[in-house]
Amino acid sequence: MNKVQPIKDPEKLRQIQEDLATRTDPHGERMFLLFELGIHTGLRISDLVRLRKKHVCGEWIETVEKKTGKITRIPLNTTIRAIIQDRCRDMDDDQLLFPSRQRLGDGSQYSITTRCAYDDMQLIAKQYHLDGHIGCHTLRKTFGFWHYKQNKDLEMLRQWFNHTSQAVTLRYIGMDEEERRKSVQAFNPGGAVYHPRGTVYRGKPMQKSESLEIKNLDRSKQGKIWGSRAQQRRK
């Protein structure tokens, strides 16, 4: 089973935000608000889709987590508060932020499903060619990934997600993979220097002009030069 990934590319993340912000159709406006709330709060999709305007009017979101049954309080920064005020100004306090187009038998509204939110994320992943597996946890993980990148406070993030250990948090936000990737960027066990045409010369790297001089020779002469240098190194 593929592990759901955060959005790590800052350019793609910014592009998604800017493009969704310009959407004026109901579906696009819903996707924009859901996306921004997700990456600014780290709430699970199952909690986001149940939010009402009264939950997001102040400086904090206070809600009962569907998964754990615990009360959680999430601070809202000025950016997401401005978005909420702009997009929700005409809503009643008890109105759902993400209502389904369908109605219950008595005519009352209910929220979109997590499956609907997943489908929205798949549309985004396809349109912007996002790397890795994208799903409902992508927004929560994107929040965690960038919160850690900017603040470097793993313990705060662990408490935010209510994880049992910092190691769990690192794996969850994909930073364990990021650290592994960085660790091999300059990793070269044998110290080999690789030149054009796949030739390998151990030891002191050749000067650029010397490398080009050999490269421009035909293959038979290249082989003789490399062979003679290998013999010199063995002496």
PLM region descriptions:
Residues 12, 41, 50-82:
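Conserved tyrosine-mediated DNA breakage-rejoining catalytic core shared by Y-recombinases
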Residues 67-69, 163-186:
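Catalytic-site neighborhood detector that most strongly recognizes the C-terminal catalytic loop/helix
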Residues 6, 10-41:
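Basic, Lys/Arg- and aromatic-enriched nucleic-acid-binding interface segment
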Residues 47-48, 133-134, 144, 152-163:
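Active-site-proximal segment of tyrosine recombinases
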Residues 5-6, 66-85, 96-122:
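C-terminal catalytic core of Y-nucleophile DNA break-rejoin enzymes
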Residues 6, 79, 174-230:
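DNA/chromatin major-groove-contacting recognition/catalytic segments
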Residues 30, 131-146:
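Short basic/aromatic active-site micro-motif
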Residues 34, 42, 46-50, 157:
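Alpha-helix N-cap/helix-start motif at helix boundaries, enriched for small hydrophobics
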